[in-house]
Amino acid sequence: MSATETTTAVEYLQPRYSPRITGRDDAAERGQPDIELSQLSSQPHNDHETTPNRAEPITQELKPVDRGRDAWCTLLGAFAFDALFWGFPGCYGVFQRYYSSVPAFQPDSPRIPVVGVLSTGFYYFGSPFSAMLATKFPRYQRQQIYLGWVLSITGLLSASFTSSVNGLIATQGALYGLGFVLISMPIVSMVNEWWVARKGMAFGLISASSGATGAVLPFIIDALLRRYGYKITLRACAVAMAVLTAPLLPLFKARLPASDQANLARINWDFLKKPLFWIYGSAVLVQGIGFFFPVVFLPSYASLFDISSTKGALLVSLMSIAQVLGQFAFGYLSDKSLPVSLLITTCCAFAATASFTFWGLAKSLPLLAIFSCIYGFFAFGFGTMRVAMGRAVSDDPSTVFATYAIFVFLMGVGNILVGPLSAELMAPREAVREQYAGNKYEPMVILTGVTSFFAALIVLAWHGGKVLLK
């Protein structure tokens, strides 16, 4: 079929008729999964007949999936939004280090990590609810994006006027996080419609986007904080985000008509009865408990060994570069014939090994740099597997969107636990450079490695020791 050929979705003019059959588009003819469309009965229409209870149908052309200008524009817009709005809280380790040195924040310094936890935690825990809004009211997905855009930028601007940790928690943490989760799920829904056979590649590219900005943004933020302070830095970030992303808002458009989106929103929940879903969900939950510690505390860990803030930002940057490569690579591999469980265990095994060795034994910049690269590639690569896990559980496109939101939610449990766990793990311990992980960070390093190891073990145990390639 040529690139100009499209599928026709037909709808009744009279609302009391809503018959459904399965429609195939050009993607399906290439062996890709079908997408259900609202269509008429297969009986041909006779122009000379008059049917009192039936109106003449109208047609609406659907554009091809996995290619074409609109598909790529939606994907590139999603890449840019995720790069900026997700990349910013990903650099919170730099902010946390600076906030810890501000005299006004000293009385509440143990609560400073809560700001970063909320800015990302809203995304993780709010994803199922944002996804419900996006599917329940498909006509208003773009409006949902606009609302989230305004809230996120307002959160940063408001944070620049506060002088307390509580103020930062409410603005840079909660308000920004709420805005981002409202942005994210409608965009995920649109990308899910436009990309079918290459879905893993598409979501791998989106996931890698925050790493692309994370390779540069820590240096910019660190320089701004040292020169201008946090208030000017937050205002500059808010203005930059608004200017860079506002022109991209018109790029986001759904592929399917709103009526067909509503039909796809009727999710088949049979995947909840499949043991494999719970196995993957358990692995995501366990891995997420330890996943965030290196992201948040690596610059602080480096400072324990007299590594400068600039070099600490370099470690975050290296991890972000590795994240880009890892998430795109594993997203691409998930579209191929490689077993999903093999990819999952590979990611978790390498992340665990890097944590126990290169992080725990590191007392200098070179070893920490090696850890940043290995952990960034494999631990973040695991996050890309959410789409592949959903497809392994069910072929239904709407189910993939639902499982994606659920897996994001499960990973968010670890994100929320970072603050209280870090306080409990680090508070009673003194820093001793000669000991493993500087003594102060030893429980944190061990927990990070153990959770990745057990996530791999859960999947391996389910397969009963069988060769994963079968």
Residue ranges and their predicted role:
Residues 125-167:
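Conserved MFS/SLC helix-loop-helix module at the cytosolic interface between two early adjacent transmembrane helices
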Residues 394-438, 448:
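A late C-terminal transmembrane helix in Major Facilitator Superfamily
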